[in-house]
Amino acid sequence: MEECKLDINKGKDAEILYEEYKYHEIKEMSFSSCARTSPELLKKFGCDAHVITSVEGAPKKENKKIWEFFKGSNKIKNLFTMFTCCFANDEEEIWGEETNESVVYKEYTYNSRWKIEIPSYPVREIPYVVADTPYNKLLCPLSSLEWVSKLILMDNANSIGMKNNRYSTNPFIYGMCYIIRNNANRILLESCYCENSTGMSTCPRILEFMPYEPLLKYNSYRLLSTYENSYKELSEMLTNNNAPLEVLIHHVMLYHYYPSFLQSALWTAVSSYLEERCNNGLYSKLLVKAAKQHFGDIRLYFVTPDDIYTFDHCNNWIAIVTRNFMAYIETKRKLEFDSIPFNCPLITQLFPLISSPKEMAWLLLIVCTDSNESWFPVHAYINTKTRILRPRSPKLDFFLKESDLLYFQDKQSISEFDIIRKDLLEDLIQCDSYVNTREQLRRRRETLNRKRITIAKLQNNHSQITFPYKRHNIHKSVDSIQFCKPASNLLTLKDNSYTQIPLEPLLLAEISV
């Protein structure tokens, strides 16, 4: 058999070798250096900075998916099949079979030399601006609104004029409060510490997250090509439901910036997580079905319907509240009877699964908050319930770990991203440990179940056993049977036959198991 060789002079062979060569070249080249010395590479990989700009007369931003830019690259053809980040769009989102989650990117303007100064850190604090907030207002469970109950029955909208069953409460005692407003083309998260439910106790701070899309594409290509095995192993762990909650939350918060194979793995892991907790009533089948359909934003699937509230006489804010956590999300659709788009095929599929007003409240949370939910600090919310996550810096409200911000920073060498690989390996170690622990617990449960079955059989059958000695020689407590000196070692069976068994060791061994 002749050895297969690549013809470097023409066709796909030349393109493959070119991609491999250029990958090693950009491995040690920052985004800004590549834009200065090899702009054709940025253009080839869809990372051309000139595609996105707000300067008049410059090319407008094209609404394409990243996989279209990468389809010529052989190295990541299977790995990077689709990167489903959706681009900022001023038009109202169209609800179809699968919702398009908007990811807002920072639009940088060019200077006179057509250069962009990318900030070294993608998060900055901006001056606080006093704005209308729902502080000092009572909360009511969203599920307690009468029109929410009417939605389940599909009653006419005229019925909402009937007596309202809402009631006021506020479970919040103290802790962090977050506010997510409608901000066109900006990612802002307001936070403060509150000592009680009446308002702010510390000066609020507003952080802005500034992801630059071409830089993200460039870094993603470098990272996914360099650490391909680690990302694939992570995908397998997520798909097989072998990731603990901390690992799952870590990568859920990066969902919008991951390629499609990791996004699909995250949806599978989340749906498995929810399905395991349906039996205890924490979540419902509605959430499991919606997760399998990739409906809405993945962060809100960890919110229990009991924690969803709204405000008295206010239909454009929704709140997620626990004893030590409070988040106000400004809705893009008003909380009204006709908020649910019943013409959406996916919602039509989910509607038969809604059996309570609380489930309807969760569906309203998904539909009405729209893309604002993408920045819900789910790690802070989860930590008030589980306490499994370590305290984080306020600058990490957007993500779980500080190393995650490296995806959005311009670094010269690929070695500067080693901390990302370190975190990936730590997550994989946690997954392995979680698998071993869960297997040990499963075996222990099986052993305990066998013991309980044995005890139950003894309790049900002990009265049918005829002992060849007087009954007063046995204490009546079945749970602690003790034997005096047996008269014989013969055991009378149901068919009146006898078998020679060491009776005392047998029963004591069975009951002590």
Curated annotation (Swiss-Prot):
InterPro entries in UniProt: Meiotic_expression
Record's keyword terms, sorted: Golgi apparatus, Meiosis, Membrane, Vacuole
Coiled coil: none
GO biological process entries: meiotic cell cycle
Pfam families per record: UPF0300
Cellular component annotations (GO), alphabetically ordered: Golgi apparatus; vacuolar membrane
TM ranges: none
Broad class of where this protein is predominantly found: Golgi
Subcellular localization: Golgi apparatus; Vacuole membrane
The keyword Phosphoprotein appears for this protein: no
Function: Has a role in meiosis.
Family: Belongs to the UPF0300 family.
UniProt-recorded name of the protein: Meiotically up-regulated gene 133 protein
